[in-house]
A protein has these predicted regions:
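Conserved phosphate-binding/catalytic loops in two-lobed NTP-binding clefts
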Residues: 76-80, 226-245, 384-391, 540-559, ...
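Short glycine-rich, Thr/Ser-proximal phosphate-binding strand/loop in the N-terminal lobe
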Residues: 4-45, 115-116, 120, 314-354, ...
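Gly/Thr-rich phosphate-binding beta-strand-loop-beta motif of the actin/hexokinase/Hsp70
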Residues: 1-20, 94-111, 302-333, 404-420, ...
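Glycine-rich phosphate-binding loops at beta-strand->alpha-helix junctions
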Residues: 64, 198-228, 239-243, 370-373, ...
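Glycine-rich phosphate-binding loop plus the immediately following alpha-helix
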Residues: 34-35, 112-153, 240-243, 249-253, ...
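Phosphate/ATP-binding catalytic cores across multiple sugar-kinase/actin-like superfamilies
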Residues: 182-206, 247, 291-300, 497-520
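An N-terminal assembly and electron-transfer interface module characteristic of large anaerobic redox
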Residues: 119, 123-130, 434-442, 449, ...
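Glycine-rich phosphate-binding/hydrolytic loop that grips phosphoryl groups
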Residues: 127-132, 237-271, 395, 439-444, ...
Length: 984
């Protein structure tokens, strides 16, 4: 008989085959990271039930199986090879295998060149990701599949990583989107991730086989793959067991299974692991620490004994709802903290009704909302004030430490840190890319190891040798934890190591501090994660300073909101809130529908909440048209003006034919140049359509790497669109250099902008048989440009074009480009002047020319103008400063403008810069730090917005509102100081 054991990242699968390869026995069980014990139990069980002490051929496979196989002398077979062996034996006609496991994803091409594609550093789109999303929706994976079957539409969700997906899913939940639609969207995201991230341009066709847990258990996931690939794939019998089946077929060495189990028993970790010093030297040190933190508390007063006005603060967070009631002295009368269960409104209504019922005649003076669901809650219950969460947390922190200079708030999946200077927020950090420093990070590990998170955290307090896990992402940390277990680390030392790692991630990955000292010495920590005393202690040790952790650390947003309401109603001499009465709350109803807006080209996916009294709250809109019925006023928006300019370049009929230009990357600046050049030569210039989600998905199958920035990925869709048009040629040259504006040490294009045509030529099958002009060209030297185009480039593709014609076309191109850039600068000046006349703030929304693409910027420019500010671009003001020294090599044209714009901002009181960064941009790893340095040296706030295919602007809105609130606070502090000085 043959036995195959597949030890995966989350499960163990085992099969027993007879001599004819008939399956006699199989099992599929989760191991909860207790790999050794589970393997021993299985081996002994199979021996007792199937083999009765007889020898059997045995081999081990799976991502977690190699160490065990080595330790007991059993042959190990690599899982991809194992899968191939089983597929060839049981489903020989298969062309391609798609296998999704707990933390790994694979595509195995078996025909036209055997090849395997596997996920590397990210577990997005795997079983663990689907489990995470199901947990977020408060469902089992099976329930999520059933819900998805009832979907009416889908949303755009990132599946690259659980954190990014949460940043898409959570706002949808908070805005009231249907759970069924979200569930279907998650499966669609997994499909997109697998196709774009793994296939990387290789077509998936022929007979497709689906393997692994997610594809076995989810009918909707299989259907989504079928729809995306245009095939009907097969999920075979025993699809969960193919790696184990392959291991059994490969086995050629016999063992008594109980002997193998005993050998594992004797296996003791010989490796030693790197460790950190213990969190506490002894019990006494812990007790002193505990007592110190318990002393930082807000006075609590019995609600029943209170008479007089009250102020309510509601924090509708990413995963929880917090409510605090205070009196006129800021004392707490009542608190409530509970999970939001995917829909915060019924829970908040229940709490408000409870307060009304238990305290009849209560005088509510103000109700203030904050958090992710702030607007929804405020509109639903007619609350008085909405407060951006950063300001709510700052307001609460000042209660405990009026001269606080650094606040860190670590919640379930988000992290907020702010530096305070002169009584106002001077810098804000939010985690955009990773939740490894957050509470859900610890919770995920506690659950994986089979513990409640509170018990798991407490285990680490007195660990003698905490494991040094470094600061890494959740997926990498998983393998580190498993390795530590193999090396003999106790659960206590792993728990302590994870708590230390949370702190290191927060400080060195999110905040990117070079040293703890630069952050501040008067620190308030808040957020539910700091109730974990191991994390709190690790933070103090890493910072080298004692911090204040309030007794209401998890309620600080709600408490700050209540204090804000108290202050505002006192200023306005308001004694009665406009919130719903008890009767209105009892009659409260919420209906949610999802619609696609047809008001403009954005086609926003709107979530419309309708309440019992007929009021509506619309979310998901990037402009005010769905709410007001009027088109957005773009008169103070230079992004909108640039879009209009580019749209004005229409094809002019030409005698020589037609040229197609993809409206992507560098063409967002150079379209006027090339339009004029080709038009003058007698070609009709056609551009690809404006970017859209559909255009991106159309080109997705040819994207060769998921690490490319989103604007580069979009270019595949543009090429596909052009290939379907009747054109004589498609033109997309490689441009090493850009125009020299004299601002930097050199004037390169970034490698992606410069050479991406090479990638397209090698990966887009639709270009086969097409005339694709992607020669290397230089426009930075006009004379050389004319010579090269006339002698080397054009003759290869078109006959009969003279050098004189090329010279005239080049002159027209340079003139058109200069006129285009001059228009942008003139319009920028007009917007600045008009904004100053109206007393508006001016935001330099700085990035690259292609960030003007609405599909890339997701309407962030319009979001800023909705907040009452004017928007200009970096290239409209970069000519206002002379070249100046920078800390980095200043060699990229686009970035030279960025630095110059930042420098100019520091000289203008009413101007601030927001930097757009495309996720995955290598050059921006340098530019962001340099831009921050320039702005901070000039006393300005630095705000960075990371953007990619994610379209939900919830986190972006919080960031922008935080910036505006911080600027307002600064102005207030400055006015107060000036008034005090005048009085003195």
């Amino acid at each position: 008989m043959r036995v195959g054991l597949d030890i995966g990242s989350t499960t163990i699968k085992c099969v027993v085959l007879d001599e004819q390869d008939t399956l006699l026995y199989s099992t599929y069980e989760r191991h909860y990271s207790h790999i050794l014990e589970k393997a021993q139990e299985l081996l002994r069980r199979i021996d007792a039930e199937q083999l009765h002490g007889q020898k059997a051929l045995l081999s081990i496979s799976g991502s977690a199986g190699m160490g065990l196989a080595d330790s007991c002398g059993v042959p190990f077979v690599q899982e991809v090879f194992s899968t191939r062996v089983a597929v060839k034996r049981f489903v020989p006609a298969t062309d391609c295998v798609i296998e999704l496991g707990g933390e790994d994803a694979k595509i195995l091409f078996l025909t036209n060149g055997t090849e395997v594609r596997m996920n590397g550093s990210c577990a997005g789109g795997t079983g663990a990701f689907i489990d995470q999303m199901a947990t977020l929706l408060k469902m089992s994976a099976d329930e999520m599949n059933k819900a998805a079957e009832q979907a009416q539409r889908t949303y755009t969700i990132a599946s690259r990583c659980g954190v990014f997906a949460k940043s898409d899913v959570q706002p949808l939940i908070n805005q009231g989107a249907r759970t069924e639609d979200i569930a279907a969207s998650i499966y669609k995201a997994v499909v997109n991730q697998t196709i774009a991230g793994l296939a990387q341009g290789r077509p998936i066709k022929g007979n497709i086989l689906y393997l692994g847990g997610p594809l076995t258990f989810s009918t909707v996931l299989r259907k989504s793959f079928d729809e995306a690939l245009g095939v009907t794939g097969t999920c075979p019998e025993n699809s969960l067991l193919y790696v184990a089946l392959g291991a059994a077929l490969y086995a050629d060495k016999s063992f008594v299974l109980t002997d193998v189990a005993d050998a594992l028993d004797k296996y003791a970790a010989t490796a030693t692991y790197a460790s950190e010093p213990p969190l506490f030297a002894n019990k006494q040190e812990y007790e002193e620490f505990h007592a110190r933190h318990m002393s930082h508390s807000v006075p609590h007063v019995p609600f029943s004994a209170h008479c007089g006005p009250v102020h309510i603060g509601i924090d509708s967070g990413s995963t929880t709802v917090k409510l605090v009631v205070v009196d006129e002295k800021s004392q707490i009368l009542y608190t409530n903290y509970q999970p939001n269960l995917g829909n915060p409104l019924p829970l908040i209504r229940e709490q408000l009704l409870k307060i009304y019922k238990e305290h009849p005649g209560l005088q509510v003076a103000s109700v203030t909302t904050t958090g992710y669901g702030e607007e929804l809650v405020k509109n639903a219950f007619r609350c008085d004030y909405g407060l951006v969460e950063t300001v709510a947390h700052f307001t609460a922190a000042k209660y405990f430490m009026p001269d606080v200079d650094f606040i860190i708030d670590i919640g379930g999946q988000d992290m907020k840190c702010f530096k305070i200077e002169d009584g106002a927020i001077s810098n804000i950090f939010l985690n955009e890319a990773c939740s490894s420093g957050c509470g859900s990070f610890l919770q995920t590990f506690a659950q994986a190891l089979g513990y409640d998170v509170k018990k798991f955290a407490a285990l680490g307090l007195f660990a003698d040798r905490p494991v040094d896990l470094g600061s890494r992402c959740t997926v990498f940390m998983n393998s580190s934890v498993k390795q530590a277990q193999k090396d003999g680390a106790s659960i206590e030392n792993i728990s302590a190591g994870l708590s230390i790692s949370v702190v290191k991630n927060a400080l060195y990955k999110v905040i990117r501090a070079s040293s703890p000292e630069e952050l501040g010495r008067k620190i308030v920590v808040q957020g539910g994660t700091f109730y974990n005393e191991a994390v709190l202690r690790a933070f103090e040790k890493e910072m080298g300073v004692e911090v204040i952790r309030p007794d209401i650390a998890g309620l600080m947003g709600a408490y700050g909101a209540a204090l804000y309401g108290l202050r505002q109603s006192s200023k306005a001499h308001r004694t009665a809130s406009g919130m719903m009465s008890r009767q209105e709350l009892e009659a409260f109803e919420q209906k949610v529908v999802s619609v696609k807006c047809g008001g403009c080209g954005n086609h926003c996916q709107l979530t419309v909440n309708t309440f019992a009294d007929g009021r509506k709250y619309i979310s998901g809109n990037r402009c005010d048209k769905p709410v007001t019925g009027k088109s957005a006023d773009n008169s103070l928006n230079l992004y909108a003006y640039k879009q209009e300019l580019l749209a004005s370049y229409k094809p002019v009929p030409g005698k020589r034919g037609s040229i197609g230009i993809p409206l992507c990357l560098g063409f967002y600046e150079l379209l006027p140049f090339w339009w004029a050049f080709w038009t003058k030569l007698g070609f009709a210039v056609h551009t690809s359509p404006v970017s859209s989600r559909g255009l991106y998905l159309a080109g997705q199958a040819t994207i060769p790497s998921d690490t490319a920035c989103f604007p580069a990925k979009l270019s595949h869709g543009h090429i596909k669109a052009l290939s379907q048009m009747e054109l004589d040629a498609i033109f997309y040259p490689c441009l090493t250099y850009n125009v020299d504006e004299g601002l930097g040490d050199n004037h390169y294009n970034c490698p992606v902008v410069a050479y991406y045509p090479e990638v397209l030529a090698g990966n887009c099958p639709e270009l086969e048989g097409k005339k694709f002009i992607y020669d290397y060209v230089g426009i930075h030297r006009p004379k050389d440009f004319v010579h090269k185009m006339a002698k080397n480039v054009l003759p290869k593709y078109f006959g009969g074009i003279s050098e004189k014609e090329v010279q005239e076309a080049a002159a027209a191109a340079y003139a058109e480009y200069e006129a285009h850039m001059a228009k942008i600068r003139v319009k920028g000046s007009e917007i600045i002047d008009e904004a100053r006349r109206q007393g508006k703030r001016i935001i330099v929304l700085a990035g690259r020319p292609y960030h003007v693409d609405p599909e890339v910027n997701h309407g962030i420019d319009r979001l800023i103008t909705r907040h009452g500010a004017a928007v200009v671009t970096e290239d409209s003001i970069s000519n206002r400063v002379q070249k100046f020294p920078t800390s980095v090599l200043n060699q990229w044209t686009y970035h030279s403008r960025l630095y110059a714009a930042a420098k100019y901002c520091t000289t203008q009181k009413d101007m601030d810069l927001v930097q757009l960064v495309s996720f995955g941009c290598g050059v921006d790893a340098i530019t962001t730090d340099e831009t921050r340095e320039i702005l901070q040296a000039g006393g300005k706030l630095y705000t960075q917005l990371k953007i990619d295919e994610i379209t939900n602007l919830g986190a972006v809105n919080i960031r922008l509102r935080s910036l505006f609130a911080a600027l307002d606070e600064r102005d207030e502090v400055a006015e107060e100081k000036a008034a005090a000085k005048a009085e003195a």
